[in-house]
Amino acid sequence: FNDVGQSADFFLRTLEDDASNVALLRQAFLTQYYYGDIEQAAALGRQLEGLNVVVPLGGEPATALALRNADWPASIVLADRIAEDGQALAMAGVIRGWSLVAAGQGDAGISALLEAGRMSIDVDSGMPPFFRLHAALMAERLGLVNEALQRVTGLEADSLPSHVALDLAAFYARRQKWDIVDRLIDTQLSRQFNQTDVRAALEQGTRELPAIQQYIAAAVVALALSDNKNSGQSLAARLRFALFVDDDHHFARLLLAQQLSDYGQTDIALANLERIPDGGMFGQLARLAESAVVEEAGDSERSISLMKAVADRDPGNAYLFHRLGDTYRRNSMFRQSRNAYMASLALGRDTGGLHRSLGVSLERLGETQAAETHLLRAIEIDPGDAYALNYLGYWWADEGRKLDQAIAMIERAVSHRPSSGFFVDSLGWVHYKLGDPARAVGYLERATELEPSDPEITGHLGDVYWALGRREEAMFKWRLALTLSDDAEEQALLERRLRTGLTPCLLYTSDAADELRS
């Protein structure tokens, strides 16, 4: 998937020289679909059909073409072809249902949709809620308002995915039931959404019914997200399908951009995010995603600028100031991160994650008493917060304070995250600080197995080996740590270790500054 664009081009060019190669034809079809060239994929799909070759997703690009062109009779026929893929029966039913409604066969359309819903029933959770919603939307489209309202009665009280909640809110907005709309916005949407923008977009959307293509695109996305068996490539294909049918489906574009970013296609991801305008239902989510993508790409200045703009636009949203603080903290701007976290607290946010992150920033600023207060508050809110437990425990152990409490905290952190080399390192290091290198060595050896490229952990193991009299092994670990480190102070400390070893006065200490001065 990382090179799907190049793959699509490669298979298409190769096919020119070997047009009868069915294997190449299949790969060319799939990569064109995943890449988003629906028209080319549809043409290749017709070639495969002419050869009586069945391929997964085979009928979908041609169906997308028919839907975009509002060729409802063709869409109905092509939906039956999609159904030949046993994994796409529900998608076929949704497309067939809406196409029948568009063709004036409303009752048959609702029946086809609900039959698809019955095929999607989960033993634990029942029928996915968007089937009920789309049955109501079909009834609304047919002018059967009372039936539509009846079909979604009580649905707003269920736990709904945000995209389903927004489509339900849009339905109630068209019915002028603003109390339900506001309840959906308040209870079903995360704080990543700008609630004012969402409300304004819903008000604007009351002027006319969406096009049939918009309903189908929304249903295809909802169906793809509800299918836990969907591979990343299948999800990408369905998102491309939805965007081909409805180019303004901002939620599908947001999801596609996030997926592209996950696979390292930063420029294409950003190009998609930039097509989602500020405001509206998904503008704020797009800017948050954009900030994350550019930070991952190494542009911290732009990431911070985007985050500040989002927070300025939605100044009463405590979540945004928490996230802005995280962006500052990851860039070692601890004074700014502290201020952002304090703004989030002032707006009423009181989560363990916020107190932990604020505590870390305060500790890095030397405000130790306040830092401990917030780290302890994080643990009070979430006694299983392994990061807060490890951070506070390691801090105390590294400074030789409250060692019994420190080791108990780190043991709790390791019990929650036994595969974290950093937490296992902390546990070994505190035993070393307590003067028990024999007990520490097993933990530190395990930590280096879990995090073999971390210079600090590797250096810790070298210290323990030295304390145990295993001098050659200690030297080896310090040399390895030196090659792994890019920190000047750490490199100087390791070079000193390699020249003189650990003198008795430095055993079981960790004050690098004192060691470098000695």
Each PLM stretch: what is its role?
Residues 33, 67, 101, 140, ...:
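Position-specific recognition of the canonical hydrophobic site in helix A of tetratricopeptide repeat
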Residues 30, 64, 98, 134-137, ...:
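Residue-level recognition of tetratricopeptide repeat
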Residues 23, 57, 91, 127-130, ...:
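Start-of-helix register in tetratricopeptide repeats
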Residues 27, 61, 95, 131-134, ...:
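Canonical tetratricopeptide repeat
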Residues 17, 50-51, 85, 119-123, ...:
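Structural marker of alpha-solenoid helical repeat scaffolds
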Residues 508-516:
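Conserved small/polar residues in nucleotide/adenosyl-binding loops
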